[in-house]
Amino acid sequence: MNVLNRRQALQRALLNGKNKQDAYHPFPWYESMRKDAPVSFDEENQVWSVFLYDDVKKVVGDKELFSSCMPQQTSSIGNSIINMDPPKHTKIRSVVNKAFTPRVMKQWEPRIQEITDELIQKFQGRSEFDLVHDFSYPLPVIVISELLGVPSAHMEQFKAWSDLLVSTPKDKSEEAEKAFLEERDKCEEELAAFFAGIIEEKRNKPEQDIISILVEAEETGEKLSGEELIPFCTLLLVAGNETTTNLISNAMYSILETPGVYEELRSHPELMPQAVEEALRFRAPAPVLRRIAKRDTEIGGHLIKEGDMVLAFVASANRDEAKFDRPHMFDIRRHPNPHIAFGHGIHFCLGAPLARLEANIALTSLISAFPHMECVSITPIENSVIYGLKSFRVKM
């Protein structure tokens, strides 16, 4: 199967799963798959799907058995660190880690708090607002823009780019797939050109931002090339926008949905880190990851052959009854909480500390600012690779 056909097969397999589930409440489908077909094979598209915690963790984390490297066409995000195997992954990761140390993240905490407070002030006098549009979307976009060292004036364009890069075709028709790939390729060309210009500026005039750190960072005497930096910047833009936006929205929805939790967090803000971890488990922003088998291996009594494509449903694993007590309950005091919402192994999410920091500040500040809040309405994102809300209206 060639590169394009592999990409299309994965998209079709994801759409097959999406069509069997409610956009924001896929959990009954996950539960039925864990019970009836924990390792299933899509004959039409030649793609495996795994749903149990131990199986998902193995597929996602075992670098000897499963590869993240899928040959891409001209794709900046496709050529980023998430789609690399060692030794190239090791080299890139060791360099970019320098931009995400606890010390670097700690330096950004006051600014993230400042941005959060400024956003809350804009809607503090209203009786109702859209939590996504007014808060959980702009906050991560502004933060990641400043972290990368690019003007936040590009915020709307950033959102358009990142939305497109995580989108999927409207349906399984050849026309829809062709139009989707053409639009996505155009988007990636625009992003690559944009970041190439920013990187050149930082080489000539470095500042206190992540791109400058990466431009200056050296590993065994080598600096990262533009070809290595551009995909990583694209990945940061997309992950920094989509994942954190959906984490904040999903967390607040879960908090409001569960009686007494909002009031408990208002009285005990020290519980917020645990609440964020539980939100990651309960409503994972990235519900599915994909891998390719590097050699023949057995999972759940099924032979997965070398070269087979596998979809690992992280959101299902995080609700596996064999791993979590009362998995369908949102419990902010859950301990331990070994969720795998940020992945596992060498591809554990590099931006996890930033996402956690933003979510903790955002949710604590929101709950502190409003003595009462309730959900008015939600509109889910119709997408098979990300999980979140397009709109989330709340009233105070």
From Swiss-Prot:
Its cofactor is heme. Keywords: Heme, Iron, Metal-binding, Monooxygenase, Oxidoreductase. Heme binds at residue 349. InterPro entries: Cyt_P450, Cyt_P450_B, Cyt_P450_CS, Cyt_P450_sf. The keyword Hydrolase does not apply. GO terms for molecular function: heme binding; iron ion binding; monooxygenase activity; oxidoreductase activity, acting on paired donors, with incorporation or reduction of molecular oxygen. PROSITE patterns: CYTOCHROME_P450 (PS00086). Its EC number is 1.14.-.-. Signal peptide: none annotated. The keyword Membrane does not apply. Belongs to the cytochrome P450 family. This is Putative cytochrome P450 YjiB.
